[in-house]
Each structure stands twice: as structure tokens, then as C-alpha cells.
Amino acid sequence: MKKLLIIALMMMLSMSDMALGKVNPDQAPDEEEAEIGNFDFIYGPQSNQNEAFERTEMLMSEAFSHLGTRYRSGAKGPSAFDCSGFTSYVYKQMTDVFIGASSRDQYARNTPITRAELQCGDLVFFTSPRSGRNVGHVGIVVDVDPVTQNFTFIHASTNSGVKISNSTDSGYAKRYVGARRIQL
């Protein structure tokens, strides 16, 4: 009985080693190398998502580093910004991509997206008191509520300089025009 128990225990340990990949006498060295060389899970679509996440994280870090910077009409940074100067400066610093000089130019030249498609790093556009129904203000999306589609954004405000606002704030809720994505 003891012998049978010992044999059964040894077989179980042997099987657990095979299941963990420790021992497999039938596996040829070529198969083992092919298995080791298969890094598709690293370099496949997931890797692209990781790169996009890192780019967005760096973009937002650059944007946040300017919180509190004063507003000045026509200023392109880094000591002062207007709204489009802020967005173009942040994108130029982090991606070396020119997204347009004015809020209207940025709205016209970048890829349109719906509010439901908003992601961190997208540009959001609003009218301004002087622009009538036309685009007159721009910011960069910080966060989006997928249920309500409300979002927070960082922008250069005429009264407060670079700050974070919410799309539900009374000054922005009715002025939203649309959103654009920067193709990197």
C-alpha cells in the first residue's frame, strides 16, 4: 500500500512539473525555441495600446505642468498662453506635430469625432462670447464619463489662465461645438 501511495505521489509531482513547463521530455528543442521566440503578445495590438497610453500620459503631464500659467491673448507659451497657443504648444512639445495656430484652424484641420468617442488627449471646442456660433475656444480632454459623456478639460481661460474645467460648468455647457482627434 505504501509503495502504491509513493508511486501515485511521484506521478502527481511529475505531472505538475510538466504542467508548469518544467519537464517535457517529448518537446523538441526547436519547439521550445519557437515558444520562447513568440513575442506576438508583446508586439501585437496590445503593444500599440501601451504606446498610445504612454504618449497620452506624457501629453497630459506636459499640459498639467502649465497649470496656473497666466493668460495673454495671442501668447504661444511657455510663460503665457491663449487657448489655442496652449493646445498647440503642448502637442508640439510632446509629439512634434503642428495641430494648427488658432482654435478655428485646429477645428478645421484635425479629425472629427463624436462626443461619444471622446478620449483623454482629444481637443474639445466651444464658442466664445465674441465668436458667435463659430469656434472660439479650445481645450484638451482630461477625463470622460462614458455614461453621461460629460468631460473635464484643461485649457487657457481668459480669467484664470491654464486651469481644469468641466463640460457641465455654466460657462461651457451650452457652448460646446465639437471635438477633434490628433492623428499621430
Each model region followed by its residue ranges:
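Aromatic- and glycine-rich peptidoglycan recognition patches
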Residues: 4-7, 18-34, 38-39, 48, ...
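Residue-level detector of flexible, active-site-proximal loop/helix-junction positions
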Residues: 11, 78, 106, 160, ...
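N-terminal signal peptide c-region/cleavage motif recognized by signal peptidases
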Residues: 14-16
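N-terminal targeting signals for Sec/Tat export/insertion, comprising classic cleavable signal peptides
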Residues: 30-61, 65, 72, 76
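Catalytic cysteine-centered active-site loop
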Residues: 49, 69-120
